[in-house]
From Swiss-Prot:
Enzyme Commission code: 1.1.5.4
UniProt cross-references to NCBIfam families, sorted A to Z: mal_quin_oxido (TIGR01320), PRK05257.1-1 (NF003603), PRK05257.1-4 (NF003605), PRK05257.2-1 (NF003606), PRK05257.3-2 (NF003611), PRK13339.1 (NF009875)
Name assigned to this protein: Probable malate:quinone oxidoreductase
Matching Pfam families: Mqo
Coiled coil: none
Catalytic activity: (S)-malate + a quinone = a quinol + oxaloacetate
Record-level GO BP terms: tricarboxylic acid cycle
Needed co-factor(s): FAD
Keyword Flavoprotein: yes
One MF annotation (Gene Ontology) recorded for this entry: 2-hydroxyglutarate dehydrogenase activity
């Protein structure tokens, strides 16, 4: 027994030593020796998703002569988070997402919903411009009109009524309709009301100008257009293995072809890491002090999906419910109309899954590989402070097929198991951030990382993500290139995004003009709140000077 305890103690000590060595290992890339006369490109985009495609499009329109490289580890672009089946495609506008509004001290706070709605208006302007320029094809190939509905029952009816009363005071939500009449809700979303208990108290709001967006289609179309530019080069099946700074303050991005095993590098003045969940790991390679404050917490999602025409024909809406008390924002249930590659589907979910992977096509070692001496304590602290989230994830992972079907029946009472299949969605990596002098926090939104000189940038986090990608990348341009966005790029940015630098939540006239323009261009449903405008032909509004 003593011998066993001795060996056990030695084993524990060895494990502790190995753990300490692992945590204190160097994680930054080694500097690559490059030739003085080696060519330097203007920008490297890591990841072939919606963010890189959008930023690359901005660059080619603002600086047509820039040399740009894009690296994607899979054999095609738009196969991870941007893929149609890997995201909810909701066109987040703040219309139906009740987690964007909360009641504080008896007052309904709608600022976050206004923020998201304003950002999506920027996205629609960006896509409209690309349609006008022939960069994006027929709008229905990537966006379709789908009303956005918030639906509740029981005690949540009062919450929705208060939410509606507050939201219609904002120009961004003019035109929103509210009802407690089951017959009206059945007209809006037949599946939701079919065979529902007639004694159950229900309520819903509806925004006609809502949409469903296929971000995979947008990504592919943008990248296809970028490929027509001789100054742009896409390399697929290529994994970025290092990002290091050179003595002249440029950066070297090292990469490996996953099919041939060949390694190489490229020097660049600017790096954007738009690699979805893998952005945290790649950012650590830079060795930047600012990057040490980040860690990641991966969460996956599953959806029940049907393409049965008898069901999909009855549902043309995105219906969002309200998360259970104490549940995290990612748990908001919704039953959505989706148009993917020309076919109509209905999805319900999400059901959270757990995996150590940072990407759907990643490795189970991703979480471990991102752990180091700088973030291990913040990760532990956040885990202990968010036991409700841990409990929620455990309950979700333990769900049976019958449990998931019962959840679906809360939104589609007549649902039958044989009509639905379970589909694994994408991975999202929530940010764990430890700023100096502040406690570590778990964040549920997106965050732009920019080095002090703006040469290295990254997008971290999850929702609303793809829905507001044109706004997010515009914000990134402002952080990384402040002089250009205020100077020589300013006029072009106003041409691409007419409302650039304008607050649409405070300018109902401009908002109306913008929505008429984008809705007519993208084929969306919109009725102007101004009677006088209803008789006018929608045209692109004149950009305001900065």
């Amino acid at each position: 027994m003593k011998k066993f305890l001795k060996y056990l103690l030695v084993l524990i000590i060895l494990i502790l030593i190995a753990g300490i060595v692992f945590l204190f290992r160097p994680i930054a890339s080694k500097q690559v020796q490059t030739a003085k006369d080696e060519p330097v490109v203007d920008a490297v985009l890591v990841g072939g998703g919606i963010m890189s495609a959008t930023l690359g499009t901005y660059f080619t329109e603002l600086e047509p002569n820039w040399q740009i490289r894009m690296f994607e580890r899979l054999d095609q672009v738009a196969q991870e988070s941007s893929n149609g089946f890997n995201n909810a495609g909701t066109g987040h506008s703040g219309f139906m997402e009740m987690n964007y509004t909360e009641e504080k001290n008896g007052k309904m706070e709608i600022a976050k919903a206004e923020k998201v709605a304003s950002q999506f208006e920027v996205a629609k302007q960006f896509w409209s411009y690309q349609v006008k320029q022939g960069v994006l094809a027929e709008p229905k190939t990537f966006i379709n009109p789908v009303p956005h509905i918030a639906f509740v029952w029981g005690d949540n009816v009062k919450f929705l009524e208060k939410r509606y009363a507050a939201m219609i005071q904002s120009p961004l939500f003019k035109g929103m309709k509210f009802t407690e009449d089951p017959a009206v809700i059945k007209q809006w979303a037949p599946l939701v009301m079919t065979d529902r208990d007639p004694t159950q108290k229900v309520a819903a709001t509806r925004m006609e100008v809502g949409s469903d967006v296929n971000y995979g289609s947008i990504t592919k179309q943008l990248v296809n257009h970028l490929n027509q530019n001789p100054n742009f080069k896409l390399q697929t099946s290529t994994e970025v293995t290092g990002i290091s700074q050179n003595d002249d303050k440029t950066w070297t991005v090292s990469f490996k072809n996953l099919k041939t095993g060949k390694t190489d590098h490229v020097k660049t003045r600017f790096v954007f890491i738009g690699a979805g969940g893998a952005a945290v790991k790649l950012l650590q390679l830079t060795g930047l002090p600012e990057a040490k404050q980040y860690a990641g917490f991966p969460v996956g999602g599953e959806f029940l999906i049907t393409d049965n025409p008898a069901i999909t024909a009855q549902h043309t809406a995105k219906v969002y419910g309200r998360a259970e008390l104490g549940a995290p924002p990612m748990s908001v249930p919704h039953i959505d109309t989706r148009y993917i590659d020309g076919k109509k589907y209905v999805l319900f979910g999400p059901f959270a899954t757990y995996s150590n992977k940072f990407l759907k096509n990643g490795s189970q070692l991703d979480l471990l590989a991102s752990t180091n001496k700088s973030n291990v304590l913040p990760m532990t602290t956040v885990g202990l402070e968010n036991l409700d989230l841990v409990k929620y994830l455990v309950s979700q992972v333990m769900m049976s097929d019958e449990d998931r079907l019962n959840e679906l029946r809360k939104y589609y009472p007549d649902a039958k198991a044989e009509d639905w299949r379970l589909s694994q969605g994408g991975q999202r990596v929530q940010i764990i951030k430890k700023e100096p002098g502040k406690p570590a926090t778990l964040q549920f939104g997106t965050e732009i990382f920019a080095s002090k000189d703006g040469a290295v940038t990254a997008l971290l986090g999850a929702s609303p993500g793809a829905s507001t990608s044109p706004y997010i990348m515009l914000n990134l341009l402002e952080k990384a290139f402040p002089q250009q966005t205020e100077g020589k790029w300013n006029q072009k940015l106003h041409e691409i995004v007419v409302s650039y630098k304008q607050d649409l939540s405070k300018d109902p006239v401009l908002l109306d003009k913008v929505r008429q323009y984008t809705s007519s261009t993208l084929g969306l449903n919109y009725t102007s709140p101004f009677k006088a405008a209803n008789d006018e032909t929608a045209a692109a509004p004149v950009a305001k000077a900065n």
